[in-house]
């Protein structure tokens, strides 16, 4: 399923109703970037929930910078804070070989660093996670080092 933890915890109100009862994140405020392989059930669930999705086809069609501008605008107009969940397997395996799922035609390291910098510039990031780094599959710590660089950019590090 697309949201395994929310599905699992849906029946545990003591975990889902922290601070107040009800939904904490509206699906319409969720944005995915770089999707390459969604199964039919995931696609239907995301469409039904109103999740915004920019696939790698969209990146090719409209250009990466344009998509990032749309994402920044999407969040700055809709929310007061952002949680970033960056899944390293969105990257092309050439740049991140140490992930569990290695699909070709993913984001480049430069695109990912640019994305993190632009999201950081919104000053809306309140929490983040960088996931899917598998050291067993990594080559010369390439994926791990990139993950650290991405976190640094998200925390405000600039090249210049």
Regions found by a protein language model. Name each.
Residues 1-8:
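Short, small-residue-biased leader/transition segments that mark boundaries at the very start
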Residues 17, 35-38, 70:
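N-terminal catalytic or cofactor-binding beta/alpha core of small enzyme domains
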Residues 19-25, 76:
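Solvent-exposed alpha-helices and their adjacent loops that cap or buttress functional pockets
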Residues 23, 34, 48-49:
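His/Asp/Glu-rich, glycine-adjacent segments
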Residues 37-48:
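Short, glycine/polar-rich helix-capping loops at beta-to-alpha or helix-loop-helix junctions
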Residues 45, 52-160:
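Catalytic cores of soluble, metal-dependent hydrolases
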């Amino acid at each position: 399923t697309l949201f395994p933890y929310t599905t699992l915890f849906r029946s545990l109100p003591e975990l889902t109703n922290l601070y107040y009862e009800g939904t904490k994140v509206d699906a319409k405020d969720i944005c995915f970037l770089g999707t390459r392989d969604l199964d039919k059930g995931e696609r239907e669930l995301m469409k039904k929930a109103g999740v915004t999705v920019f696939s790698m086809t969209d990146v090719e069609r409209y250009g990466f910078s344009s998509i990032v501008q749309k994402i920044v605008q999407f969040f700055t107009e809709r929310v007061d804070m952002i949680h970033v969940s960056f899944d390293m397997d969105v990257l092309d395996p050439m740049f991140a070989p140490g992930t569990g799922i290695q699909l070709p035609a993913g984001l480049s390291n430069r695109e990912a660093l640019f994305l993190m910098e632009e999201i950081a510039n919104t000053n809306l990031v309140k929490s983040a996670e960088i996931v899917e780094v598998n050291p067993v599959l990594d080559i010369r710590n390439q994926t791990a080092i990139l993950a650290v660089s991405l976190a640094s950019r998200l925390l405000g590090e600039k090249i210049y």
